[in-house]
Amino acid sequence: MRLLGAHRAALLVLACVVVVVIHGLGEAEALGGGGGFVRAQGTRFVLDGNPYYANGFNAYWLMLLAADPSQRGKVSAALGEAAGHGLTVARTWAFSDGGGGNALQLSPGNYNENTFKGLDFVLSEARKYGIKVILSLVDNYDSFGGRKQYVNWARAQGQGIGSDDEFFTNPVVKGFYKNHVKTVLTRKNTITGVAYRDDPTILAWELMNEPRCQSDLSGRTVQSWITEMAAHVKSIDRNHMLEVGLEGFYGASSPSRIAAVNPSGYQLGTDFIANNQVPGIDFATVHSYPDQWLSGKDDQAQLGFMGRWLDAHIADAQAVLRKPLLIAEFGKSWKDPGYSSGQRDALYGTVYAKIYESARRGGATVGGLFWQLLVPGMDSYRDGYEVVFGETPSTTGVITTNSRRLRFLSKAFARARQAQPARGKGRHNGGK
């Protein structure tokens, strides 16, 4: 009887939350924003008037493999398997800078059309499987060129640049980046015929994967860059949401959070609060890798940190930013000393529980993307964090359970919305 009572109480709470959320969705609908594009409305994602949860995965490699037609089957397999497990969002790169391999941008403004066609294929296949895509526009790191490559291009044109951090301030470098943004956003897909900026398959643009600027820990340099580039993106594309690509480290705007929440030594020139308050930034992101940030700590300490890290960001997204929060990267490596699949499952379970509880209460957390999804035959891409569904049954079960719970919430909100009378219409003039 106690369990039954608890179940009834939970349903009552959910019903109350549904009423509150549906009221907000009526306001969202009044503002427009259908047509298959996901919008940020308050602290929620909304798709055609209903709450939308970004339940998904990272697969940075999608464009790189799709650039080779003989490898496209792996892209299709990954998207198909993801959809089969209830995943709805993929995050991937729309960059690869420099002259090596399947680079996208060979030099400033000079693009490899075969690689661009690979990205066309990714978006076409994602649409086929009902998966939305977040496209990141440049990397902080140099594995795929990133800001170091941009700086080197500027040096080759005679710019006297000292540090790679001048990526954020040098006018020539910023011009290169703005040109790349415009090229990607205005690209017309050779398969679908739809310009990227008009394609609802794209969930959002990301300014940079994990921006950092250790030469200016005040955060002012990155803040200025975000402000300029957010305005640039929005001047080209008003259809899609935009996010920064932040890991979530707190900065000067919230000094108490630096000591209480940031892992020790992780103040890297970004500011979770200030950066996400920039006009044009539609939602906040956070990444979390306790096994890297707290290496040497035991599993319980890492799980405890994960809980505190997420709680702080969820609370701040709700009360301070008043914007949606996406947990855009999280994972645990099998290369960690003493690793067991149970440890990974516990970490995934912690993340998913935080997402579900926030979503169930109508809170700011709109989903999570694990790092990373692979399919068989991709051994060279294994980094320790990979999930291959057929090889990891327990973790796959955790992922699938989360998909099922979020799908239940989506359906509950959708049913409640359908049961609501049309806003602004009387009883007798709403049709049959």
Curated annotation (Swiss-Prot):
The keyword Zinc is annotated on this UniProt entry: no
Principal subcellular localization: secreted
Active-site feature positions: E210, E329
Cellular component terms per the entry's GO annotation: extracellular region
Compartments where located: Secreted
Signal peptide interval: 1-28
Protein residues bound to substrate: W93, N209, Y289, W371
Reactions performed catalytically: Random hydrolysis of (1->4)-beta-D-mannosidic linkages in mannans, galactomannans and glucomannans
GO biological process: polysaccharide catabolic process
Gene Ontology MF: a single term: mannan endo-1,4-beta-mannosidase activity
InterPro entries: Glyco_hydro_5, Glyco_hydro_5_CS, Glycoside_hydrolase_SF, MAN-like
Tissue expression pattern: Ubiquitous.
The keyword Thylakoid is assigned to this record: no
This protein's UniProt keywords: Glycosidase, Hydrolase, Secreted, Signal
Its EC number(s): 3.2.1.78
Pfam families: Cellulase
Family as reported in the entry's similarity comment: Belongs to the glycosyl hydrolase 5 (cellulase A) family.
Protein name: Mannan endo-1,4-beta-mannosidase 1
Top-level taxonomy: Eukaryota, Viridiplantae, Streptophyta, Embryophyta, Tracheophyta
